[in-house]
């Protein structure tokens, strides 16, 4: 059966589609409390903006377009994410088919994406903008390899579309087209692709896609870059100078190993001696891919040396190293050895990973009393809503964080949910509110309902004065009853008379 599934991209895609349907069903069955990225999407889906803060807006635009038609729900948050992630796998398979002669190897390369922790597990757990980045990276690889093999106006435009989408999905995507451009230069047979007239409309298309956000960026550079720079520099952990450079280079090495180790070990274990014999094989396409990965990683070395980055995360390497599995299978195919035994050993890895990932996604929520680590999805928002609205319903909700705001938006799909000073000054909706307004926040820790000075100050600046601060504490969902999560809240009357 597994051999039939991996016979072509079509059969493998059907198998993958069934897997993603199971992921959707599992998310719908689990508590409808949103994790941080989901909550941000829920909150941001009220607005169509050129920029939203530290993350580029592509995923937000997609989510806004869907929510504006269907309304907010758990389905609307889960289904688009899984479709985009499925698209990542599909275009990766199509990219593999451009460089691999064997249709079976291309299908297996596509399915093998699940062995990359950042793709198989982390993208399903909590990430959204990274899912868009993965999709754009696969789309770019497909257009890039198609252009090298058989250039058409369509393949060039595909590169332009992927580049535009990638740049407004995650800023680190910019490394990929730069690395691809440099990687092609030494290959005489493909160098002409870089001076082809069809590259111009591709560039124009990419610019048009990026333009709305690019016009927003200069006036909002601080809000767009500060959180990322803070995570990259980790100043509280690394002193300036050589110690910071050393920590940054070490974190880069650890991130690379964390990204590539598992699939390499699995493929090496399956193909055994054939894998090590294949490492010496080469071809023009192999050399291009090698240069792409090396140039991308050198760009991160430059970030460490010249931007002071000391904390490189694995997911930042997605556009640099996603091509790894195509590279490994291309090495095996180019070695011109019998791969049948290795393929038979490797095929079962994919369904095993599917079962393991679904089990992790389930057990991390329902088994927290055994694990001891409580997730945001275990916060009992439905219980809070039942308690808070037993006697009255809000006409407006003012939240202290995006986590609170997004979850309240899901619970009250017809009620505006706002955060002070986003997207503009104060809370203008308060002045027009006729009826009870719910102000709700959380503290620094799970059992701390203390209102933060910053949020309290923003409320005062917005003309909202809290008559009484109250606390609501409920046990975590699926917990042992001993651990709880607390929120603070206050009811005020709207400003409209």
Curated annotation (Swiss-Prot):
InterPro entries: LipidA_mod_glycosyltrf_83, RgtA/B/C-like. The chain crosses the membrane at residues 14-34, 74-94, 104-124, 127-147, 165-185, 199-219, 249-269, 292-312, 321-341, 348-368. GO terms for cellular component: plasma membrane. Its main location: membrane. Pathway: Bacterial outer membrane biogenesis; LPS core biosynthesis. It is a multi-pass membrane protein. One of its GO terms (molecular function) is hexosyltransferase activity. Its EC number is 2.4.1.-. It is found in: Cell inner membrane. Disruption phenotype: Cells lacking this gene produce a normal lipid A structure with GalA at the 4'-position but a modified LPS core structure as this gene deletion results in elimination of the addition of GalA to the Man residue, but does not affect the addition of GalA to the 4- and 5-positions of outer Kdo. The mutant cells are also more resistant to the polycationic antimicrobial peptide PmxB. The keyword Protein transport does not apply. One of its GO terms (biological process) is lipopolysaccharide biosynthetic process. Keywords: Cell inner membrane, Cell membrane, Glycosyltransferase, Lipopolysaccharide biosynthesis, Membrane, Transferase, Transmembrane, Transmembrane helix. Belongs to the glycosyltransferase 83 family. Involved in the modification of the lipopolysaccharide (LPS) inner core. Catalyzes the transfer of a galacturonic acid (GalA) residue to the 4-position of mannose residue of the LPS inner core, using dodecaprenyl phosphate-GalA as the donor substrate. Seems to act after the other GalA transferases RgtA and RgtB. This is Lipopolysaccharide core galacturonosyltransferase RgtC. It comes from Rhizobium johnstonii (strain DSM 114642 / LMG 32736 / 3841).
């Amino acid at each position: 059966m597994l051999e039939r599934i991996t016979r072509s991209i079509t059969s493998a895609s059907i198998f993958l589609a069934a897997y993603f349907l199971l992921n959707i069903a599992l998310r719908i069955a689990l508590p409808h409390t949103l994790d941080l990225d989901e909550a941000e999407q829920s909150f941001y889906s009220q607005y169509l903006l050129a920029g939203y803060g530290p993350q580029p807006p592509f995923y937000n635009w997609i989510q806004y377009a869907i929510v504006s038609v269907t309304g907010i729900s758990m389905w609307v948050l889960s289904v688009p994410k899984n479709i985009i992630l499925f698209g990542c796998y599909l275009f990766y398979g199509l990219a593999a088919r451009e460089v691999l002669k064997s249709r079976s190897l291309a299908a297996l390369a596509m399915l093998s994406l699940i062995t990359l922790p950042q793709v198989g597990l982390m993208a399903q757990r909590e990430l959204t903008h990274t899912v868009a980045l993965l999709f754009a990276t696969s789309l770019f690889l497909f257009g890039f390899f198609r252009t090298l093999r058989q250039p058409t106006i369509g393949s060039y435009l595909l590169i332009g579309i992927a580049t535009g989408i990638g740049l407004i999905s995650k800023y680190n995507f910019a490394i990929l087209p730069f690395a691809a451009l440099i990687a092609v230069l030494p290959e005489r047979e493909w160098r002409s692709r870089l001076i082809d007239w069809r590259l111009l409309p591709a560039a124009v298309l990419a610019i048009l896609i990026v333009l709305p956000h690019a016009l927003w960026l200069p006036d909002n550079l601080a809000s767009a870059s500060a959180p990322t720079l803070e995570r990259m520099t980790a100043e509280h952990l690394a002193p300036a100078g050589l110690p910071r450079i050393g920590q940054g280079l070490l974190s880069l090495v650890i991130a690379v190993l964390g990204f590539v180790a598992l699939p390499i070990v699995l493929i090496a274990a399956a193909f055994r001696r054939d894998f090590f014999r294949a490492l010496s094989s080469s071809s023009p396409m192999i050399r291009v891919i090698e240069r792409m990965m090396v140039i991308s990683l050198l760009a991160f070395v430059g970030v460490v040396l010249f931007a002071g980055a000391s904390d490189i995360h694995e997911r930042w390497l997605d556009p640099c190293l996603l091509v790894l599995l195509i590279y490994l299978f291309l090495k095996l195919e180019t070695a011109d050895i019998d791969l049948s035994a290795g393929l038979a050993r490797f095929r079962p890895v994919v369904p095993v990973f599917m079962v393991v990932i679904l089990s992790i996604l389930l057990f991390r929520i329902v088994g927290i009393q055994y694990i001891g680590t409580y997730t945001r999805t275990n916060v009992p928002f439905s219980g809070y809503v039942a308690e808070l609205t037993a006697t009255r319903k809000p006409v407006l909700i003012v939240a202290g964080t995006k986590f609170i705001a997004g979850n309240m938006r899901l619970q009250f799909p017809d009620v505006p949910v706002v955060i002070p000073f986003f997207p503009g000054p104060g809370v203008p909706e308060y002045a027009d509110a006729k009826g009870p307004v719910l102000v709700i926040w959380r503290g620094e820790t799970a059992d701390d309902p203390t209102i933060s000075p910053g949020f309290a100050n923003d409320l005062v600046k917005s003309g909202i004065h809290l008559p009484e601060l109250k606390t609501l504490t409920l046990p975590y969902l699926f917990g042992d009853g001993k651990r709880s999560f607390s929120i603070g809240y206050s009811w005020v009357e709207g400003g409209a008379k």
